Amino acid sequence: MELDQVGWRRSRKLCTDNLDQGSKTLETCKNIGGYFKPQGPGTEHINELITGDSIVSAEAVWDHVTMANRELAFKAGDVIKVLDASNKDWWWGQIDDEEGWFPASFVRLWVNQEDGVEEGPSDVQNGHLDPNSDCLCLGRPLQNRDQMRANVINEIMSTERHYIKHLKDICEGYLKQCRKRRDMFSDEQLKVIFGNIEDIYRFQMGFVRDLEKQYNNDDPHLSEIGPCFLEHQDGFWIYSEYCNNHLDACMELSKLMKDSRYQHFFEACRLLQQMIDIAIDGFLLTPVQKICKYPLQLAELLKYTAQDHSDYRYVAAALAVMRNVTQQINERKRRLENIDKIAQWQASVLDWEGEDILDRSSELIYTGEMAWIYQPYGRNQQRVFFLFDHQMVLCKKDLIRRDILYYKGRIDMDKYEVVDIEDGRDDDFNVSMKNAFKLHNKETEEIHLFFAKKLEEKIRWLRAFREERKMVQEDEKIGFEISENQKRQAAMTVRKVSKQKGVNSARSVPPSYPPPQDPLNQGQYLVPDGIAQSQVFEFTEPKRSQSPFWQNFSRLTPFKK
């Protein structure tokens, strides 16, 4: 097998024996054949389709990062319209309005290539399998919808088998060898670099085992694989931990690779395992890419599944499940990327007491200024409130410098329930109420009373509290938490920023506090009721606008006594 054909579709001869035991080796899989190569007649077929006004689409297998003006940059999973494939190594393609050259080895042609369809990520074009060569061919139209579905099924099965091989190579080729070198790697380092890759490998073997049971080898279009995704839907959440840890893994690898010993060691591991010629960070990226490709594959499968097919409703449900999984994983990854900002905000608050925000929280959900009365005192006080997951922090503005905040306490949201109150007089506090709500401690019976300036602001706060509880429940479901390494990294970032500004980190400059914002209109963290999560988040390219609260950090002026 040639090792330089990364990303091209393999032929349809597949090894399945003993796959569930994870014992397949490179030697026993050599019958699989090579990836589909766009060379010779294959390239001519592609150009014939292009010149014949057919649309030829390819999916990016790897990220292509370039600064060259005439090259096309893209990310794994992007769909590229191929405009010219005359050169076997470099093709000319288009994404949206951008055109440019890109390496042919970084993409693979989609399973089906139909003539005369409109371009779009959800469009699948026509192709067929040559029964004599077991290779994917292009150029001959397929009228049989069942054959199209069979092509997609075969593609899913093929990629799953190849993915298992990648995971096996990582676990046995790299991780196993690293554990033998205690002089080079500590347990903590291996945990950071490889995360829970072994858990993913075990889960994926069980998933593929069930897929094989549902696969109809004689009539692939009759296969019912939708139930497999539904049965294993909870298992896919283990990818969240891996994706959240991936940035730390890259940083740790980058530090190690500065030492030539580690470069030679990882290269020796690759050669010993007879792995394809890509660096270890490329292999470790595979699970991240894999989880975000499931919705693409299932959407393609659903398109060619008739509504009267026994698998239709299961595939539709599986597509919804996998979209939700990838969206939630993306959301949690975004939250981890924001923890540096939370740490910087805490460092800017004067007179801070107690545990750090990051010990329990990872997301600023909503912020605003309200009047507040605490039961024992019954005194109306104006405070600025910051609602995080698990807790709400109370701050007071400086009398002269209104952009300076002082820490005044916090409320444990895990112990309180929110009570909406109608306008009128409250007997407990003996005050008239308008736009008010309470936080009631279920254990101690303590009560906090809050007054919003307007009814709309009260509604936003009530919605924010519901969002906070929902977020906590979802985090508990998938075991989301900030690792100690990530907390240390955030603390280091704060010290670095403080040092660059020449300000002591213990009294770093606070941000200018913005007026309360509408989270539904200003790009904050609440999602309006009735708007699908898919309209807000995408796995590979989150489009959430940055909260105006954080943007003030870039406009700070040094604080002087």
Curated annotation (Swiss-Prot):
What is one Pfam family matched by this protein? SOS1_NGEF_PH
Residue ranges crossing the lipid bilayer per the database entry: none
Stretches assigned to the SH3 domain: 53-112
Renumbered residue ranges of the record's region Disordered: 499-524
* Keywords (A to Z) from UniProt: Cytoplasm, Guanine-nucleotide releasing factor, Phosphoprotein, SH3 domain, Synapse
Which portions of the sequence form the region Interaction with GPHN? Answer: 145-155
Q: What is this protein called?
A: Rho guanine nucleotide exchange factor 9
- Protein's UniProt keywords contain Magnesium: no
Q: What does this protein do?
A: Acts as a guanine nucleotide exchange factor (GEF) for CDC42. Promotes formation of GPHN clusters.
Q: Name one GO molecular function term.
A: guanyl-nucleotide exchange factor activity
